Amino acid sequence: QTQQFTNDPRVPGIGFAWLMGRRNGRRVVMHGGDLWEFSTQLLLAPDENLGLFVSGNSSGAAPLADELVKALFDTFFPPLEAAEASGAVQPAGGASALGVADMAGDPRELAGVYRTTRRPLTTADKAVSLLTQFRVAARDDGTLTLAFPPGYGMPMATWTPAGPGLYRDTAGDDIMAFDHWKAVAGKARPSRMYIGTWAFERVPVYETASFTLATVAVIAVVFVWAVMAWVFGRRVSGLAAVLGLVNLAAIAGIAGSLLAIPGWELTTAVPQMTRAALALPPAGAVLAPALVWQNIRRIAAEKRRQRWTFYSRRTTRGLTAIVLPWLVIAADGAFIWLLHTWN
């Protein structure tokens, strides 16, 4: 079994259906598969006449398999010396000749949120990638930390510099490489990250889980404000309140349906309840232009009744009545954009 492809010459690649790699400096070929709360791993060490098959269920199956393989190799096949581990990636120069900063550059350039390139792009399950984002952070000592998505059940990993744009897992033989550098906010940052045979891409800020959740929260607050302003004091028109209520129902329906079903169903199809909730935002998109027209007519009517200034409008109708309808329109547009972003 020989390597046929690699994402980057500095990291292990893939042969004919087998993933190439190293454990404690020893050559291994492996393959695995994971579904929701199920994990299987087959590993062969040809030079050691070793074969291992592990399969398990529940959310802890994947880390359990990794721990078992690590314990087995640490016990029966301890780490080789660097000179013996032929084929292992070595820095271009010893640590004595190259300082950590020279070997790795500025680790802060590598920090960010990444996601695997094996993901849906044009269907609604693209949103599942919100749950599978990896966060890379830089430490003051020049090392990197890799935080796995919450559902993976994997502990945070620490990576030490092993060359320019190259890092090694402190708990194993995995190599992390960064490539495809692009200018972001005036600084050169990598757009790709490779760990073994896995390829990752840097996530744009507007598609990170934190940005998406914060945006949904702000949008929901505006819609709740509109409904409450109409219920208590009629400080906005009924049209603004209805638009807010329709979108709140959509947000609650989408979130509720995704939380109510078993997680594994998300990997097969979009739930019917979610589809029903997604039918509400288009209705809101129809109401939004009507609200714009209503606001314009109201402003025109006030201009005819009196000499119009912002102060006069603020004192006769109140700031909420002036600003909130436009915020509702903006929030509706942001909600439609968000749904379009995630198909």
Regions found by a protein language model. Name each.
Residues 213, 229-343:
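Alpha-helical transmembrane segments forming the membrane-embedded cores
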Residues 1-231:
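Catalytic loop of the DD-peptidase/beta-lactamase superfamily, centered on the K-T-G motif
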